[in-house]
Amino acid sequence: VSDGQGEGHERTVLLGKHADRAVLESAAAGRGWRRAAISTAGHGEMEQVAWQAAGAFVLYSEVHLLGHRVVRVTGESEAAVAEALGAVRDAVPTVSPDDLLDVLLAMPPAESTQMIRALNGLRAADIWNCANGRRQPADPRYADAVERAVRHPERQVVRALVEAVGDLMAVRPGLEVPVLALRDADGPARDVIEDFAGFCDAAG
């Protein structure tokens, strides 16, 4: 996974379902951003386009496995990162991790397909942090979202949650706790939780 170059500040957003990559590329060209790198999608890989903006590195990635497109902006200056991210948001519809957490914490609960997409989105948003082992600041909303989703009555939601926790717990420690607490409980995804608990036992 390519994550661009050295950074002091970083912001990540996902593109909305109907965002047009061509519009983003046109906006980048219009702002004079220099195309920095591109990789061709292959099996299990991501298609990526990168630009060098004024004081910032902008990386667009299509995370095919998770069904999301991500833009990560890094730079030494918080202002430069904010400016480049603002240009992205002006060009195309975006979704932030805050938006995804809102879906997972909604009352009444969101539809299962929306919850699964939100869980996959959180995985995509943290994909570089997971690759680099870069721990993230504590955010209690993540644990609250896990607590909510692990008790969902639909198996596919719990499976998506367990897969997300498996990715994220290295950079957001403690997310596995609500899952492991249900290892002996009956439920539609008991086997999924048992398998995850066994993985944690082996890893620990």
Residue ranges and their predicted role:
Residues 1-59, 63-65, 80:
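Short Lys/Arg-enriched alpha/beta "domain-start" segment
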Residues 43-105:
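Surface-facing alpha-helical segments and adjacent helix-coil boundary elements at the starts of domains
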Residues 94-106, 128-149, 172-183:
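Amphipathic alpha-helical scaffolding segments comprising HEAT/armadillo-like alpha-solenoid repeats
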Residues 108-125:
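HEAT-repeat alpha-solenoid elements in large eukaryotic scaffold proteins
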Residues 116-120, 161-163, 194:
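Hydrophobic core positions within HEAT/HEAT-like alpha-solenoid repeats
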Residues 120-127, 166-167, 198:
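Structural signature of alpha-helical solenoid repeat scaffolds
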Residues 179-204:
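Eukaryotic acidic, Ser/Thr-rich intrinsically disordered low-complexity regions
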